[in-house]
Amino acid sequence: MLLDRIGFYFPKALSNFLILYTCCICFSRIDILPRIVNVVLLITLSSFALYTYWKIIRVGAGSPLEYSFLKIQSIDNVLNRTEQPPDIIKDNCIFVKRDGSFRFCQTCEIWKPDRCHHCSKCNKCFLKMDHHCPWFASCVGFRNQKFFVQFLAYTTVYSLYVLLMTSAQLYSWFRQMKYKSELLDLHLLVVWVLSVIAAIATFAFTTYTIWLVTKNETTIEQYEWGNIRHDLEIYGDSINCNMGSVDNVFDLGSRSANFNCVMGASWAELLLPIQVRADDPFDPYANQGLFFPVQSDTYRIYRESVNLQQRLITRLTLRPSIEHI
């Protein structure tokens, strides 16, 4: 219990402390820029980083538990195949379990839409789950993915700015040979080391995350694609078709389209932490993370694979009944 509390609060306290500490040190130690310029830049960058950090946590990834029609009435009936998922799952979900049945979570007792996964750390299912991030002690998914990408970008820019300023300040200190008359500012040196580490780490992770966004792929899907391709190859063998060229079904055909569906199409949506998804008055479940736009050709192949698996399961479950007649 105590360890759980520490694991929940410590990352948040540490993350905020590092941003505020480095910001305060740069406030008081940097004098190579006009003070007002330095203050405005530091406040702007650190504020964006802190705001998106807490927005990621407050908004959350989104969970299928919020939709009552996805609730399973009886796990036993689902396991016995006497309870079926709602039509929205049957009509829109592409991925099924290896035995051909629709995906569900026994822990949450919920039908799982495509891209939904259960987090063992949070003990909860999340929509379009990307990963569980220990720095937030929460999951990144459908609703907060945009803010997570922005947080990484803001933090990268902030880290690079702090690195540039502290490097220039330290260079000026050595160049003026102040080491002959005074000690090196330990706080400034610590902030420089932290900014080096943070700049490298956040830049690498930001690049990787944006790359996944342009592919319309989550971190989990990146690792699961091998299993999915294996299942499609089995289906391809059954119909004498080569499935080696099948793409990610959620790839919208261009990197810009994939990027815009997460980050928004306008510069304001891209640069500012504002919501980009509008409700569809004709479909209350659109843009809710329950289902996603797909490539028509790839979708057809996936659906044929699902239908084949469903027919095989139906045939196998009917055989014992026929044999007992």
From Swiss-Prot:
The keyword Transmembrane applies. InterPro entries: Palmitoyltrfase_DHHC (IPR001594), PFA4/ZDH16/20/ERF2-like (IPR039859). It is an enzyme of class 2 (transferase). Autopalmitoylated. It comes from Kluyveromyces lactis (strain ATCC 8585 / CBS 2359 / DSM 70799 / NBRC 1267 / NRRL Y-1140 / WM37). It is found in: Vacuole membrane. This is Palmitoyltransferase PFA3. Its main location: membrane. It comes from the Eukaryota. The lineage of its organism: Eukaryota, Fungi, Dikarya, Ascomycota, Saccharomycotina.
